[in-house]
């Protein structure tokens, strides 16, 4: 029962869906959350877990903003064509811009986080699934001439999505510290399926997907999107789909990979 209470309390703190203005509201901290970490003091633990929630919310805002900036430009297919440059780099113009993908790390994380990189999957998802839907009404398959801007905005979109997904290592670390005796047997056994079951929070994922739809709608109002023509608007289902079908599953994958190495 105590184990379940520890897990539930952390879940309530990290995975309670926020309204767009709830980041600045006072949160109820349960006593069990304060004693959850073996290594962090009371104040540090509270600040850290609250910081994780706030950072994730800001990352979500950044993703929506970057997609909006990218959407008016054309696909510019040739910026994704792989070439060999004069300095020997083999890849597309966008790959060159993002080859030094930034994985956000801080000392509080276990060194296992440094070896986790699923950027190739993020690349395939963004270029193959998201971008065609994002720009399909703005010349998909037809270059609008502004290749540099298209490539630069693809870079910032990719970086924002990558940071959000890889930041889930912080969520995994917080979950582990809250209930190490729950996670350690599965980690020692290298039981990937059990760890996946531990990190899954279906209700929170569904709530997050719904919240992204609300954030997108609020963003439209903030940007006075009602003044734009229909062809200049992003498909309203794109952002929720991005989260529900791709970002949330990839964040789970990162958490599992991190936890499998947590005791190394």
Q: What residue ranges belong to the model's regions?
A:
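Context-dependent free N-terminus signature
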Residues: 2-8
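Extended amphipathic alpha-helical regions
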Residues: 11, 16-264
């Amino acid at each position: 029962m105590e184990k379940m209470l520890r897990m539930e309390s952390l879940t309530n703190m990290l995975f309670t869906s926020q309204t767009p203005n709830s980041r600045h509201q006072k949160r109820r901290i349960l006593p069990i959350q304060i004693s959850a970490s073996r290594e962090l003091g009371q104040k540090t633990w509270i600040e850290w877990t609250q910081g994780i929630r706030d950072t994730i919310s800001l990352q979500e805002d950044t993703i929506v903003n970057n997609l909006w900036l990218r959407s008016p430009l054309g696909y510019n297919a040739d910026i994704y064509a792989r070439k060999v440059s004069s300095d020997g780099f083999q890849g597309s113009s966008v790959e060159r811009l993002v080859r030094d993908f930034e994985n956000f790390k801080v000392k509080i994380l276990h060194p296992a986080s440094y070896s986790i990189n699923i950027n190739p999957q993020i690349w395939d998802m963004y270029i193959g699934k998201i971008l065609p839907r994002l720009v399909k009404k703005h010349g998909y398959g037809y270059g609008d001439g502004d290749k540099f801007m298209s490539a630069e905005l693809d870079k910032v979109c990719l970086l924002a999505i990558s940071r959000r997904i890889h930041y889930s290592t912080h969520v995994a670390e917080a979950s582990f510290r809250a209930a190490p005796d729950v996670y350690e047997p599965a980690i020692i056994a290298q039981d990937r399926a059990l760890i996946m079951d531990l990190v899954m929070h279906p209700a929170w994922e569904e709530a997050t997907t719904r919240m992204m739809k609300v954030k997108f709608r609020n963003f439209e109002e903030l940007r006075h999107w009602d003044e734009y023509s229909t062809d200049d608007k992003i498909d309203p289902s794109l952002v929720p789909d991005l989260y529900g079908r791709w970002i949330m599953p990839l964040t789970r994958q990162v958490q599992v990979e991190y936890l499998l190495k947590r005791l190394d």
